[in-house]
């Protein structure tokens, strides 16, 4: 057991202190729920988003991330069944429309560390003005960390503790919070992730040097309509945590007829991101739209000599009808 503790105290903190603790995404512009829980249900649709990301292709042990997210808005209109004292069934209107729900799971490999995470989100939406919406979101999160023992060497790999405790890993719970403001012309938000900075518990002890650092995100964008069917959207995202240097993404996205998106983003610290996205609207279908996205992240640092860049694929499916979606919010 002591060897297990030593491995976690040396390998795990080193991995987490100098690499990203949270999954990194390039196409968050099209699914802000990944960085802000308040976004859940803000556009009135029910949407599914899938992402596959391969970071630093060609570099051994580089991060590889897969994620699946779901978000929805509770119907404004509808009815619920209520039993009266005479056991009669009565349909009464639901007093909803301001509540959003979301869920998010991911699997991430980063060097020797493999982790699986989940998030369950509750959001509340209210109108500040006729066309400006304020959203608040709170999420319960959990992360399961495990060391890939196949990439480690031991004198006696058949020891019992190696096959049980080490393979089982550790579970770290936490919470996220977010604020999001949405208007037809602009949007901005702030989120704080891993609020409690939870520490891993190995055996009967909690090790504070292996803890989840609090992360802060601030995002903003503005919508410019230059001609019928042609739009530009400049955006900026600031990220900061206790272990990593502040980082910013500064980008511009071209939108054509709400069917084609093409973007270019500069990431401080040495990164250039290009992305493209298409929307397909099938005839006589139950879903509203199907979205395909692809992004390439070119690293401008020394690591570019041994990699083929970072590649990210996304697939999104949106459901909605006139009773649950807000058409002026349908920007993506």
Give the positions of each predicted feature:
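Short, Lys/Arg-enriched, disordered terminal segments
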Residues: 1-5, 332
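Sec-dependent N-terminal signal peptides
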Residues: 4-14
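Sec/Tat signal peptide C-region and signal peptidase I cleavage site
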Residues: 15-19
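Subset of outer-membrane beta-barrel
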Residues: 20-332
């Amino acid at each position: 057991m002591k060897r297990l503790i030593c491995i976690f105290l040396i390998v795990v903190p080193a991995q987490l202190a100098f690499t990203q603790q949270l999954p990194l995404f390039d196409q968050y512009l099209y699914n802000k729920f990944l960085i802000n829980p308040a976004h859940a249900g803000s556009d009135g649709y029910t949407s599914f988003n899938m992402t596959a990301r391969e970071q630093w292709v060609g570099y051994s042990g580089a991060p590889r991330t897969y994620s699946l997210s779901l978000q929805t808005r509770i119907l404004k209109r509808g009815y619920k069944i209520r039993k009266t004292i005479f056991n009669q069934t009565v349909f009464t209107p639901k007093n909803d429309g301001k509540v959003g729900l979301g869920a998010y799971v991911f699997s991430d490999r980063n060097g020797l560390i493999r982790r699986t995470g989940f998030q369950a989100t509750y959001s509340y939406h209210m109108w500040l003005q006729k066309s400006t919406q304020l959203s608040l979101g709170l999420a319960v999160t959990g992360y399961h960390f495990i060391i890939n023992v196949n990439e480690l060497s031991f004198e006696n790999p058949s020891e019992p503790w190696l096959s049980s405790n080490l393979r089982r890993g550790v579970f770290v719970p936490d919470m996220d919070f977010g604020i999001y403001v949405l208007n037809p012309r602009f949007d901005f938000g702030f989120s704080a992730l891993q609020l409690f900075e939870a520490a891993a518990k190995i055996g009967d002890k909690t090790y504070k040097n292996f803890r989840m650092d609090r992360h802060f995100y601030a995002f903003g964008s503005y919508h410019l309509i230059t001609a019928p069917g042609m739009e530009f959207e400049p955006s900026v995202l600031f990220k900061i945590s206790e272990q990593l240097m502040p980082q910013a993404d500064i980008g511009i996205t071209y939108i054509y007829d709400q069917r084609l998106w093409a973007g270019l983003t500069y990431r401080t610290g040495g990164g250039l991101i290009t992305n493209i996205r298409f929307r397909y609207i099938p005839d006589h279908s139950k879903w509203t739209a199907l979205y395909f996205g692809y992004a390439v992240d070119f690293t401008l640092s020394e690591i570019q000599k041994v990699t083929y860049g970072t590649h990210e694929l996304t697939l999104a499916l949106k459901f909605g009808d006139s009773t649950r979606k807000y058409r002026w919010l349908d920007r993506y």
